[in-house]
Amino acid sequence: YKRQVFSAQAQNKVSAPMKDVNQVIDNTLDSLNKARTARPVAGSSRKGNNPILFLVGNSTMRTGTLGNGNNGQWGWGYYAGDYFDSDRITVENHALGGTSSRTFYNRFWPDVIKGVQAGDWVIIELGHNDNGPYDSGRARASIPGIGKDSLNVTIQETGVKETVYSYGEYMRRFVQDVKAKGAHPILFSLTPRNAWEDKDSTIITRVNQTFGLWAKQIAEEQEVPFIDLNDITASKFEKFGKEKVKYMFYLDRIHTSAFGAKVNAESATEGIRNYERLELANYLKPVEQDTITGSSRKEGCPVVFTIGDSTVKNKDDDKDGMWGWGSVITEIFNSKKVSVENCAMAGRSARTFLDEGRWDKVYDALKPGDFVLIQFGHNDGGDINIGKARGELHGSGDESKVFLMEKTGKYQVVYTFGWYLRKFIRDAQEKGAIPIVLSHTPRNKWKDGQIERNSKSYGKWTREAAEAVSYTHLTL
């Protein structure tokens, strides 16, 4: 490696390749035939004369060969289609893990560009893998910068000869190829890594002096849009804080979990929507507005939100029927000083309350000074991936495991019961609200003349979750 870098600098006067800061081994390219069959045929999703949005990128856009989350990692391209009107445009994710601007352009771009037609859109986000040796190993490095430098190399393992260009030159060629088809290229900066300026920093490290800068420069040169995805998501991560950012990633500091992938997809959409006069924004779905959660708020007064299962909210409409305590707790509060909203839902566990987007609605409605009463545990002990599939791992730690869900056929990372409670607690804290965690209500189940407790399972894990983040815990 040292010999090769010396040769490149001394004989060809090009810069040394970028250092591999990710330190992640991605062997996707070891199976090119599998990769080609797993990804869509370019243009195959086209509906009539509708345009297609093509996504070109690496594992942060499509993790692994299949991109199905079977290792707990997801790329943001998987969720991008959720934001577009599929009756007017389709989204094809052609990204592939392990590719750099150089390897994607040489090996996969010819197949993608074949399917591009006039009026289509192509988002290009590459650079995470433009590092390492020029002529050995994965041999995927591009020359740093946007210059016209080139380097003739012979791949040591195969004897194949190749001319290597700068990162900017590869991006320039992507853009020009798309323009030649009458389509519209958009350059994106890289997704941010879980990398902070230093151990005490609250600032996510940007790529605005390297790949982000170079992509922006090429966009300006070629007069095409540039969207700084790196900065949009990094700004969100900084508001989240380090603990929350940890689970935006899975297994390493570059590949996102489903949580992180959704944030990146949302950021990409925001960048498109907010870019002045970008026609692609016209194909986005309208932003949904929740006009119900938080609607009881009175000016200058907090809201008490309750979340949980059927013991918190049931039918609650028949004096002789079943009621949840969240529907009667209003009576003990001064309605002139506070309002109460019961957001619980029967049959939900902590996990399914989150998965169904119910917590997101509460989270979005929270304001500083609000309260959140959190009570789960009755429905959390069932099957994890079959039947109702609402159980979690036992305990309150950070353990997690990937499961294949029988009903949906999709992979999902499932965490411990306590992990979900800690997420609710920290999310509330992030918004300036006050979370209060309650152990679940007792059942009409007796032993030796006493009501049975769950003090060694869900009661214990609830207490541990609250104590882990120093928040109030009440034993119901």
Please give the residue ranges for each predicted region.
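Substrate-gating cap/lid alpha-helix
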Residues: 192-229, 442-474
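Oxyanion-hole/transition-state-stabilizing segment in secreted/luminal serine hydrolases
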Residues: 105-165, 354-412, 443
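Conserved small/polar residues in nucleotide/adenosyl-binding loops
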Residues: 1-4, 472-475
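Solvent-exposed loop/turn segments at secondary-structure junctions
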Residues: 59-63, 96-102, 128-133, 191-195, ...
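Histidine-centered active-site loop/cap adjacent to the catalytic His
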Residues: 91, 123, 246-294, 340, ...
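Serine-esterase "nucleophile elbow" of acetyl-processing enzymes
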Residues: 22-95, 111-122, 141-143, 294-345, ...
